[in-house]
Each structure stands twice: as C-alpha cells, then as structure tokens.
C-alpha cells in the first residue's frame, strides 16, 4: 500500500482492540494523526499513546457524545466507524442466539452499537467533510451483511443495514467529494469472535482472517475512493469490490 496520510486526521471507533486498534496503528504508520475512540478507556488510551494519537471515551450509540467529540476537532479527513457487538445471549453459545430469547435490552444494545453508532457517526462528521469537499467514511460491516447468518439473525440485520447505508449515503455524499464505503470481513480473529466459535469455524474449514487483512481492505477502500463501494474480505482471496446488483442510480438495460 502506497497511500500517504501525512497531515490527515483520522477517527477510529472501537479503536481499543481488534480491527479498530490494528487500523489505528496502520493509519498512524501512514502518517495520520489518529483519534482513538472506545468505551474501554484503559486499552484505548494505551493504543493512542503507542501511536502518538489521542484517546476519547465514546459511546457510539449516544448522539450527544458524538457531538461533543467531533465539534472541537474541526473537519476530519477519515472516519472509520468500526465499533460493533454481537447479540451475546447468556447461557447460549455464540453459534446459537435464538430470537425468541432476545430481550429488549439486548436488542437495543446491538442496534445501538451497530446501527445507531454508524448513523450518528456519519451524521456528525459529514457536514464538515462536505464543507471542505473531501473525506472518507469507512464502515465496518461483515460478510453477515451480504448473506444469511442463521445463528445470529439480529447481527445479520445490523450488518445488512450498514451495507445499505454506506451504498445509499455514497450516492449523496459522493456528489460533494466525500466517499463512503463498507468493509465486509469474514470471521476475523478478534475478541468479538469467541474461542468456541473459532474452533467451530476451523473444524468447518471456514477461514478466520487477521485484523491486518481487514486493515488492508480499509486502505484499499480509501485508495479506490469509490462512493458507496462495498469490499469483501474472505480468507486469502484478493480484496474485491462486491456489487451483485446494478446500483440504484444506474438504469437497467432494456429487454
């Protein structure tokens, strides 16, 4: 990757660990000043100190906290909206999250982190990006946003929402020079995937990818600068743009 981020300001949510921490380190290595945001203050501050960035406590599901974070920073060049959770029902393995046992609180938790967090984040950073006529908003979706996930249907719901949001917002933001994109990793080796789930995936021959591969995809999306693009990351296969259907703004060929 040859992209140079010198002098740019990048925000990473969920930056205390896993994919977020890896991308924060990658941005810093490429020259960016990185703002790490998370609920985990200890690990988040450690990552920020390691890369010479800054740390901010942030509940991505809280619109007021978004305003307090983004307001004083001026325009950002990159926002990586990465924070997310799975359903995680008590007394059930991660491979069995029955809908009938999901409480209202559990539902609001996952929707707040995975959907509200992306919408509130984009809403907070977009105006100043539009004002400057440039910027990148990269969202972490999942392969679960491109297909069916029978063991956690609500997680799949949230990631389908992220994919649709990134594609649709790209049609608007792209006319102002701002690129939105979604990254769809397969199962990544992070704390969101339990040891039990990793063992099950390995036994089934499903690849578990490294956070570094996801960081590669984020940089690929930024370099490509294609508004509304969706990028698939699966095993060792090349990182590719995923586009199963013609975009809404293109006319279908006549029959």
Put a short name on every predicted segment.
Residues 142:
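Residue(s) in the substrate-gating loop at a strand-loop-helix junction
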Residues 41-42, 57-68, 104:
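The beta1-alpha1 cofactor-binding region of Rossmann-like NAD(H)/NADP(H)-dependent oxidoreductases
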Residues 182, 198-244:
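C-terminal helical subdomain
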Residues 30, 147, 168-178:
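Active-site-adjacent segment of SDR/Rossmann-fold oxidoreductases
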Residues 82-95:
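Conserved NAD(P)H cofactor-binding loop of Rossmann-fold oxidoreductase domains
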